[in-house]
A protein has these predicted regions:
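Core alpha/beta nucleotide-donor-binding catalytic domains of modification enzymes
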Residues: 1-57
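Flexible, glycine-rich phosphate/dinucleotide-binding loops
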Residues: 2-3, 101, 206
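A residue-level signal for conserved active-site and pocket-lining positions in enzyme catalytic cores
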Residues: 23, 122, 169
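Short secondary-structure boundary segments
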Residues: 35, 66, 186-188
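Hydrophobic pocket-lining residues within nucleotide cofactor-binding pockets
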Residues: 36, 97-98, 200-201
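Classical nucleotidyltransferase
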Residues: 42-149, 164
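Phosphate/ribose-recognition catalytic cores of enzymes acting on nucleotide-derived substrates
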Residues: 139-198, 205
Length: 206
């Protein structure tokens, strides 16, 4: 929303195209994506429930977080949902805020851990390794000349990346299930250096 309303750029932990397989793995069978634009931003919370959730999607159950806010100027909350649906046969499930010994689990906390290069604790919160994709672009070929082919990756500018440094990583090529043990250098020009090479690694190195 802040990108649309205030032209603010916020790097994302998961790009839209990355969320789909994650949701599928969680058991989501159907997904309706509603693009957020200025017209939608002016829709009141009550009208969002009536026009979209009830009339369009014919919702029978609504699940939201305990601190959920929505609608024009974030005016809607759980009580808004209760009042608007009180005469309808719609179930409301409220998801408690998740916490651990370190405090509230949130995307801001994950970003902070990644910025500090603390991928182990980020993994514990996400329950999966943090990953990203890139397009191989031509490099100087120095690694290949030394016997260690490297893939110079151009990363989507919308993606949040861990802090600069050198990481042990697993790489895959074109969604292959074959994982390649790698050393990844994240800097102003992120690269992946393949430790264990193959014909495919040689082919895609630059």
């Amino acid at each position: 929303p802040r990108e649309v309303l205030y032209k603010e750029t916020r790097l994302r932990l998961d790009l839209p195209e990355e969320k789909l397989p994650i949701l599928e793995d969680l058991g989501i069978e159907q997904l309706v994506l509603i693009p957020f634009d200025k017209k939608l931003s002016k829709l009141s919370a009550e009208n969002f429930i009536k026009n979209i959730l009830i009339n369009q999607l014919q919702a029978k159950s609504i699940s939201v977080g305990a601190n959920f806010r929505f609608g024009f100027k974030r005016s809607g909350d759980i009580n808004t949902i209760k009042l608007t649906t009180k005469d309808l046969d719609i179930k409301l499930k409220i998801i408690s805020i998740l916490e651990d010994n370190e405090g509230r689990i949130s995307s801001s906390r994950v970003r902070d851990l990644l910025q500090k290069s603390d991928l182990n604790n980020a993994f514990k919160i996400l329950n999966r390794p943090y990953s990203f994709k890139g397009k191989v672009v031509e490099g100087k070929g120095i690694g290949k000349s030394l016997g260690f082919p490297t893939a110079n990756l151009e990363i989507d500018g919308r993606k949040f990346l861990p802090g600069e440094g050198v990481y042990a990583a697993w790489s895959t090529i074109n969604n292959s299930s074959n994982k390649i043990a790698s050393v990844m250098n994240l800097g102003s020009q992120p690269t992946i250096c393949l430790l264990y090479t193959s014909d495919a690694a040689d082919e895609y190195s630059g």
